[in-house]
Regions:
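Acidic, contiguous N-terminal accessory segments
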Residues: 2, 12-13, 18-128, 181-184
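Feature activates predominantly on carbohydrate-active enzymes
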Residues: 62-65, 69-71, 107-199
Length: 199
């Protein structure tokens, strides 16, 4: 009896919380690789991910999860880089990341939409961001949580639901994935703390 009650409560909470965890930007990823998109994965091989190792610890955990999510989708784990040593990659960080700060200083990344904001992120592309680098997909957060939310938004975009562990939501397997170039953001939360709390 108690078990049925607990299952019922969790199911009710799921119906209330799932909309809050829904993907922010529908229809911006596809399996078509073309000049209007940034390639995230080709023939099962994901684009590497770069982060500043001195950035917030929580961001590095989200990055590792994203790298593993690429394995769930295409079969190969994304390489996590500490330095920009390849020509194309995904760059993830907060406004405190040295790589993000360098892009801002060089006027290659406009983060004005994030200034003074809480838990907000921006996903965009930058051409020729660093020496010997052609293009990067940037996931930048106004703070630690913003960067983390942006990272998990990217996980959703590649086909891994935030309910993968909770509700056995199946992963959509792909060999090719690209994200349409553009500026994607999500606003500040309507409440101070967001998430699923079970007491």
């Amino acid at each position: 009896m108690i078990r049925k009650y607990i299952i019922g409560v969790v199911a009710l909470l799921a119906t209330l919380v799932l909309p809050a965890l829904a993907i922010d930007h529908k229809g911006i990823t596809s399996d078509q690789l073309d000049k209007n998109s940034f390639t995230l994965m080709q023939n099962g091989k994901p684009t590497p991910i770069l982060m500043d190792v001195t950035d917030e610890r929580g961001i590095s955990i989200a990055v590792e999860n994203l790298a593993e999510d690429f394995r769930r989708v295409g079969g190969t784990r994304a390489e996590v880089l500490a330095t920009p040593r390849v020509s194309r990659f995904v760059l993830i960080g907060s406004l405190q990341s040295r790589y993000i700060r360098q892009l801002i200083k060089d006027q290659k990344l406009d983060v004005s939409i994030l200034k003074g904001k809480s838990e907000q992120y921006l996903i965009t592309t930058v051409n020729r961001p660093f020496a010997n680098v052609d293009e990067v997909l940037v996931v930048v957060g106004s703070d630690r949580r913003g960067a983390i939310y942006g990272t998990y938004e990217l996980s959703e975009q590649i086909g891994v639901s935030p309910w993968y562990w909770w509700a056995d939501v199946p992963v959509v397997r792909q060999q090719n994935l690209a994200i349409e170039r553009g500026n994607y953001t999500a606003g500040e939360p309507a409440v101070k703390y967001r998430g699923l709390f079970l007491n």
